[in-house]
Regions:
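Extended catalytic core of nucleotide-activated donor transferases of GT-like folds
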Residues: 2-7, 21-147
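C-terminal amphipathic helix plus adjacent low-complexity
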Residues: 2-7, 21-29, 47, 286-357
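Eukaryotic intrinsically disordered and solvent-exposed regulatory patches
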Residues: 38-40, 78-81, 114-117, 178-182, ...
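Extracellular/periplasmic catalytic domains that process cell-envelope and extracellular macromolecules
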Residues: 45-48, 84-90, 121-124, 184-188, ...
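Short, solvent-exposed loop/turn segments at secondary-structure junctions
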Residues: 59-61, 97-101, 134-137, 176-177, ...
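Conserved catalytic-core segment of nucleotide-activated headgroup transferases in glycan assembly
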Residues: 175-230
């Protein structure tokens, strides 16, 4: 009953946030979700009451060492989703440390194959695992099945080649000092002092960035319409918050919460966005390539009219709650939305259920 009340409350909040956007109705009402809210919320509620996960014992005692992995793993172990009965499980969790060699990982999967019946039923397709950088293809049969069939949960952005779209999931970035959730109907950002803000990051200047990215950043640093700082302290001073794909993306959720519209700078399509099965990213973010320089960037951003800007800003505030990692998971936060993505994958492979002895 409490969860149902929460679902209704969130739906009402969603509608209240969109009221000013719907003053002039359009054929398709704006929503940050790929499916209508009337579909997403009831299905989410069903997930919270029905979804079951069975976790294997790890091959050795270990702890995840990074905050996003630790948050997800601890939340999972203390959640209502775990079951001790593998026959009622929808999915199976395969825990192993990030420093496992290919040979060690192969032996672990081999042992699961030999000691339990569940892997062989689907060749691992109803299993999932956490790997910060993802795992690469390998000629070993066990590792290959894990790579190709099991759902991988990794960091965003992922290592090139280690992510399979429509199967794998990325964790929403974790920001260490999030601000309170932006209030509904936050005033329009028309008096912003800057067109865009970008966080200065040493990693963003590393060799991993393309020359086009570096050139664009250098041009922006010399343009008074863009602000730079080592920490995103007052994002309300800028209409847009700019991110280099591959750079520091930990404050994506923070930007959305305060109503700063996201701009992702990338020279290729992005297929590993967090919550990509749930959130309609084209409604909350602008994607632009770096090759046109600061002139093209300003042309794209200046071409976004007030109506579209306010719609993106409002929808970003709605979606921001799904990027918050709480010490104790709360409905619709990052942990629950990662679980919802797993829930959506429970029917990827169907098989005849029967009792296994």
């Amino acid at each position: 009953m409490a969860m149902a009340t929460t679902s209704l409350s969130l739906l009402l909040l969603f509608l209240s946030l969109l009221t000013p956007l719907l003053a002039h109705p359009t054929p398709l009402q704006p929503s940050p979700y790929l499916s209508p809210p009337t579909v997403v919320f009831p299905d989410y509620h069903k997930m919270t009451t029905h979804f079951k996960i069975y976790t294997y014992d790890p091959p050795k005692s270990f702890h995840f060492t990074t905050p996003p992995e630790t948050k997800f793993h601890n939340s999972l172990l203390n959640s209502q989703f775990l079951t001790r009965n593998p026959n009622e499980a929808h999915l199976f969790f395969v825990p192993f440390p990030h420093d496992f060699s290919t040979r060690q990982l192969s032996r672990f999967i081999r042992d699961l194959r030999q000691n339990f019946p569940y892997w062989n039923r689907t060749l691992g397709a109803d299993h999932f695992f956490v790997s910060r950088a993802g795992i690469a293809y390998a000629p070993d049969r066990n590792v290959l099945e894990l790579k190709k069939n099991a759902v991988q949960i990794s960091f965003f952005p992922t290592t090139s080649g280690n992510f399979i779209p429509h199967k794998d999931i990325t964790l929403p970035p974790l920001h260490s000092n999030p601000s309170p959730l932006a209030l509904p109907h936050a005033p329009a950002n028309k008096t912003a002092s800057f067109l865009g803000f970008m966080k200065l990051d040493v990693k963003s200047q590393s060799q991993s960035q393309s020359q086009s990215d570096k050139s664009l950043v250098q041009e922006m640093e010399g343009d008074p319409e863009f602000a730079f700082a080592s920490e995103p302290l007052d994002l309300g001073e800028s209409r847009f918050c700019l991110f280099l794909y591959g750079g520091d993306l930990t404050w994506v959720g923070e930007a959305m919460r305060v109503g700063c519209v996201l701009v992702v700078i990338t020279d290729r399509p992005i297929q590993d966005l967090p919550l990509i099965d749930v959130v309609r990213w084209s409604e909350i973010a602008v994607f632009v390539g770096p090759r046109g320089g600061v002139g093209e960037l300003k042309r794209v951003l200046s071409g976004i009219g007030d109506e579209r800007y306010e719609r993106m800003r409002g929808l970003g505030v709605v979606a921001a709650q799904h990027f918050v990692w709480n010490a104790t998971p709360q409905p619709y936060d990052a942990f629950y939305m990662v679980m919802y993505q797993l829930w959506l994958r429970r029917h990827a492979i169907r098989y005849a259920r029967r009792e296994w002895v």
